[in-house]
């Protein structure tokens, strides 16, 4: 089984721009057979066939000539809390990852380690012994801010700051050029190089082989993949409930059963539904029935007993 290799991204960006804490590199998934299926020819098939690789930020260097291997050895050194440190840093900086910006691949080469002279050796297809060694793949990228048209226009302005425009038309003027390679030109080139820095990202690939057929590179902004927001039901405590909420189970009281109240309400409803004549006759019946009710309540057999008392 082929050993896992480390892939490295070296991103050139302006010093004033903010670096992304992680980059997602999408490339075509490697297939064992040479013939592609018909499903992969569609857009949905290409999305399923794409493989996303997350590269983590290692360090930022000032020059492209600085070696990458010492930084990788420092990061890939066995440590018990290395994975926790990376996840903690990603979780802390996930909200600050910038959404804008594009990344364009400049070059890709494969380094197989450091030679005795201290220089990095590159992979050659005709060297099978070198191919068997465990090295890393280095990809150079450049961070382009804004749209391609704006970026190209900005590059033209920075390359020729003396251009004069009239109604968006470039004017032609004559000037005497003493020397194009004078100290002023070299100073501008040095200042231009000082305005850029290089961010080093790494990915310890778990699958054998090299990264090829790159589809896109974008900042890592999926915060829900870094932080697990799924909360189990047993993790919800009673202290977190809002007692003033109407939907709280504490505010649900059982309804008291009152038969007398129901009968009184039914009687008043029936009385209100009667007309004036019916109400008058009902009052007479109630008044004539009142002595009989009193006799029954006090235990008298006849009205004479009530008069004798």
UniProtKB/Swiss-Prot annotation:
The keyword Cell wall biogenesis/degradation does not apply. The modification Phosphoserine is found at residues 302, 308. One of its GO terms (biological process) is developmental process. Disulfide bonds: none annotated. Residues 233-245, 254-263 have a biased composition (Acidic residues). GO terms for cellular component: cytoplasm; nucleus. When transfected to S.cerevisiae cells, able to partially restore polymerase II mislocalization and cellular shape in IWR1 mutant cells. This is Probable RNA polymerase II nuclear localization protein SLC7A6OS. The lineage of its organism: Eukaryota, Metazoa, Chordata, Craniata, Vertebrata. The gene is SLC7A6OS.
């Amino acid at each position: 089984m082929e050993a896992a290799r480390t892939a490295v991204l070296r991103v050139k960006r302006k010093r004033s721009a903010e670096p992304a804490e992680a980059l997602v590199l999408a490339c075509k998934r490697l297939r064992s057979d040479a013939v592609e299926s018909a499903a992969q020819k569609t857009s949905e098939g290409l999305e399923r066939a794409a493989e996303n690789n997350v590269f983590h930020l290692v360090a930022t260097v000032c020059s492209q000539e600085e070696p990458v291997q010492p930084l990788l050895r420092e990061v890939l050194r066995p440590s018990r809390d290395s994975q926790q440190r990376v996840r903690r840093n990603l979780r802390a900086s996930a909200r600050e990852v910038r959404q804008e910006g594009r990344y364009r691949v400049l070059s890709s080469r494969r380094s197989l380690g450091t030679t005795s002279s201290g220089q990095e050796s590159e992979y050659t297809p005709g060297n099978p012994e070198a191919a068997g060694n465990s090295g890393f793949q280095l990809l150079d990228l450049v961070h382009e801010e804004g749209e391609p048209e704006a970026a190209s226009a900005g590059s033209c302005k920075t390359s020729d700051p003396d251009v004069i425009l009239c109604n968006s038309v470039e004017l032609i003027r004559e000037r005497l050029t003493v020397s194009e390679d004078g100290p002023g030109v070299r100073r501008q080139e040095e200042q231009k190089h000082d305005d850029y820095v290089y961010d080093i990202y790494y990915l310890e690939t778990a699958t054998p082989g090299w990264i090829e057929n790159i589809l896109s590179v974008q900042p890592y902004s999926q915060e829900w993949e870094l932080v697990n927001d799924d909360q189990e039901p047993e993790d919800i405590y009673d202290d977190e409930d809002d007692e003033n909420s109407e939907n709280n189970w504490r505010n649900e009281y059982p309804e008291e059963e009152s038969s007398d109240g129901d009968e009184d309400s039914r009687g008043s409803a029936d009385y209100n539904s009667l007309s004036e004549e019916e109400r008058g006759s009902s009052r007479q019946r109630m008044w004539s029935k009142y002595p009989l009710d009193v006799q029954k309540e006090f235990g008298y057999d006849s009205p004479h007993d009530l008069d004798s008392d």
